[in-house]
């Protein structure tokens, strides 16, 4: 639990819990949603479980590892939830991290547009949710697992964007097995 969605954290293209929510309250809400979600749990391609529910007027999603540990949690919508801009803090002087963020943002959006009609509506909604909330590593990991496990046939354009997306991340990323093994993933799905 890194606190990237805490109020005022300011991470690029990331949703934040409402102002005034303490780290303790956020953690309690995430644990509560993980244990008692408001909708059926859904197993993701990378093995995590997606749990979602509303607490205190805020729609929250929590991803739980197969061992029961909370991997991440984030607000989706509700009173006081904000999403930070998808831009560099100082666009005139972008940092290396800003440039990586630009690549990740662009190739994520492009790839999801390309596969929109070829993935289920439920999967696409989850992928857009991860993109909206700023969970880019998780999105790359679960897309990698999806494409690897299902034999999803990428077109050359889709593969090019997917390869550029995966290569935009510094690895290893904690608990992102498929993203961390990107060479194998790319070899498996290469058209």
What residue spans do the PLM features occupy?
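Compact soluble domain cores
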Residues: 1-54
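Histidine (H) residue identity feature
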Residues: 5, 11, 71, 79, ...
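Short linear motifs in intrinsically disordered/low-complexity regions
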Residues: 6, 12, 37, 66, ...
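General structural signal for secondary-structure boundaries
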Residues: 22-23, 77, 120, 155
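Amphipathic, positively biased hydrophobic alpha-helical segments used for protein targeting
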Residues: 39-40, 68, 84, 145
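Active-site or metal-binding loop neighborhoods of secreted/extracellular toxin and effector enzymes
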Residues: 45-97
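C-terminal-biased regions
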Residues: 95-191
């Amino acid at each position: 639990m890194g606190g990237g969605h805490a109020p005022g954290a300011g991470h690029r293209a990331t949703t934040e819990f409402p102002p005034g929510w303490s780290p303790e309250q956020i953690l309690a809400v995430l644990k509560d949603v993980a244990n008692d979600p408001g909708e059926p749990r859904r197993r993701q391609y990378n093995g995590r479980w997606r749990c979602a529910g509303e607490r205190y007027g805020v729609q929250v999603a929590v991803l739980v590892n197969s061992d029961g540990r909370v991997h991440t949690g984030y607000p989706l919508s509700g009173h006081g939830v904000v999403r930070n801009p998808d831009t560099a803090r100082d666009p005139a002087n972008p940092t290396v991290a800003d440039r990586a963020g630009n690549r990740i943002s662009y190739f994520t959006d492009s790839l999801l547009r390309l596969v929109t009609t070829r993935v289920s509506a439920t999967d696409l909604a989850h992928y857009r949710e991860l993109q909206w909330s700023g969970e880019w590593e998780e999105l790359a990991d679960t897309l990698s697992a999806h494409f690897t496990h299902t034999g999803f046939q990428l077109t050359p354009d889709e593969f090019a964007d997917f390869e550029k997306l995966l290569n935009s991340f510094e690895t290893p990323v904690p608990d992102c097995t498929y993203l961390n093994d990107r060479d194998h993933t790319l070899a498996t799905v290469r058209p």
